[in-house]
Amino acid sequence: MTSSKSVHDNYTITCRPFEEDSVKELVKTDSRLSNWPVVYILSSPKEVYVGETLDYDKRMRQHLDNTQKQGLQVTHVILHEKFNKSVCLDLESTLINLFTGDGQRKVLNANNGIVNADYYLREHYRRLFDDIFDNLRRSHKLFSHSKSDIENSDLYKYSPFKQLNEEQKSTVTSISERIIDRIANDHSDLLEFIIEGGAGTGKTILAVYLMKLIADYGSGYTIDDGPGPLAEDNLDFPSVIDRRHLNIGLVIPQASLRDTIKKVFRSVEGLDASMILSPFDIPKIVLDR
């Protein structure tokens, strides 16, 4: 592929082959790629990974050594003279959800918790994000659908990478810490949580979010594989997690919602449509054990 660079409103999007020599040459062109907050995208026609880092050079070398990233072919790096850590975390989360909603590539990110945190001039940067999305779609062909179409899709609505408000963050933290502690200590007795709320209060979104979080724990992801500060601030994740097989499932009575969530799970690494169950599947699972 040919390399490219686009410049817009004080930010640049640079595209290079995801190869050691190509990344080395790119880093030589701008010293900030070794000491500046950036957002980057690694992609192939079927997969995508989004990250943020203060040291793009070092992070790319880590990814190039990661066998899970060897199928990725292209790196895009988004650089702005006024980016900071908070802006990059927000843009990273925004792009991950948009890629999930677009549905054209499997999203490889883990979910270590994404918090809907406010920061200085957030609305200004959010308008900039719209421009960045348009350029990634039109100039770099990374998205197939418009932003409005994506945001109105079920894939976007039920993305497991949704940003959490403070109440949701507290609920997820309380539940996931206790579940992961029990898994780590091989406890198998019943543990019940009841989350109450009317229609439209986000119960399904929380369930999908927790499924991804627990699946990533069992897959042996490290903290660096996923976006967001929740794990750093609250969740007691070890920095490196032992890989273990977990039988996890989400029981959904409504057939139409089951079909929708299955589509979401097919588009996200670590999740699988077979994890979505009807109430009638439960006796079969019990008998098979």
Regions found by a protein language model. Name each.
Residues 66-68, 264-269:
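Short secondary-structure boundary/capping segments
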Residues 47, 56-141:
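Structure-specific nucleic-acid interaction/processing domains
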Residues 267-289:
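Conserved RecA-like ASCE ATPase "motif II neighborhood" in helicase/translocase motors
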Residues 192-212, 230-257:
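Conserved RecA-like ASCE P-loop NTPase motor core of nucleic-acid helicases/translocases
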Residues 1-58, 62:
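GIY-YIG nuclease catalytic motif and its immediate N-terminal context
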Residues 145-167:
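Conserved adenine-nucleotide phosphate-binding loops and their immediately adjacent elements
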Residues 160-191:
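N-terminal pre-P-loop "Q-motif" helix
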Residues 213-226, 244:
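Post-Walker A helix-loop "phosphate-sensing" segment adjacent to the P-loop in P-loop NTPases
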